[in-house]
């Protein structure tokens, strides 16, 4: 078991979550996209906000897809002054 898998299992156990609900690949891809497309400090905040949205009923693939698209276009938006 990798360190990431051990950490995830431990965090899930401590928070009373099902480890199978932790879609590591989606979350890691999302935070990578935000870190590179927006700013590194934006990645953990974005992960938290996506988690809040998922907790309120939005599906993770939908939330991650929307935010990844937003991050991909962020450079263009910030250049336009949006």
Regions found by a protein language model. Give the residues of each.
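C-terminal binding/interaction regions
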Residues: 9-12, 58-82
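An acidic intrinsically disordered interaction segment
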Residues: 1-25, 81
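Amphipathic, hydrophobic secondary-structure cores in small proteins
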Residues: 19-56, 61
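A structural signal for alpha-helix termini and helix-coil/disorder junctions
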Residues: 17, 40, 73-77
